[in-house]
Amino acid sequence: MEPDRVGREPQYDLFADEFLDHAADGFYNAHYDRPACLDLLGDVRGKQVLDAACGPGLYAAELVSRGAQVTGFDASPRMVEICRERVPDAEFLVHDLADPLDWLPDGSVDVALCALAIEHVDDRVAALSELRRVLKPGGALVLSRMHPTGDWLRHGGSYFDVRVIRERWNKGWDVTYWLAPLEVTCREIYEAGFLIERLTEPRPVPGAADLNAAEYERLAREPRGFLAFRLLKR
């Protein structure tokens, strides 16, 4: 029987150290998701950036190097420990994306980033609404998530069903997330108070072909990977 909720367990805490090693130069993270999101973030010099569900701080480190003032949070205590060790010039807190950001005042952040995390939240509109609340007028949220077409091709059933998926990744990591059609994600974005400025279906950067030529060719022609959005507070 499929689960009907993702729940609140910090899934990545169990493999936080392994995930750092995997994501630092891994195909999907370093050569696919991060380049796309960093492009959408644009120039962050001097800006207050909120890194929501920051993982091991790979984005935070890059944003600090580009001149941003970064605050990050993650539900995994071990991920936050890793962040504090690796990125001492940023601030990090243990906090669940599903909870209100009650430690941040309204309109206190220039830009927010939420990379490959929103699908692990049961009430995505509430989480996105909180990110909107803390953005300054005209602020932007860069959001990435798994491409629903790729997940649907893997799991079958109706593309239009909204359902919880539990799967084991190739490193033996068990993860649970929401699979929903693109129209549902777009509706949730609008209900949370955002407009879509840009939507990209990223392709891997050219150097990724040296890591995995077959996967590079597949993602260069098929929508099986991620989506990335730049959203404006309305």
Question: For each predicted feature, which ranges?
Answer:
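A short SAM/SAH-binding and catalytic strip from SAM-dependent methyltransferases
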Residues: 111-124
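Short alpha-helix
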Residues: 176-199
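Conserved class I S-adenosyl-L-methionine
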Residues: 1-45, 58, 62, 79-82, 140-168, ...
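C-terminal lobe and adjacent flexible extensions of AdoMet/dcAdoMet transferase-like proteins
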Residues: 192-205, 211-234
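A short acidic, Gly/Pro-enriched loop at the edge of an enzyme's catalytic core
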Residues: 102-112
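Class I SAM-dependent methyltransferase SAM/SAH-binding core
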Residues: 48-52, 56-100
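A short glycine-rich, Lys/Arg-flanked "PGG" loop and its adjoining helix->strand segment in the class I
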Residues: 125-140
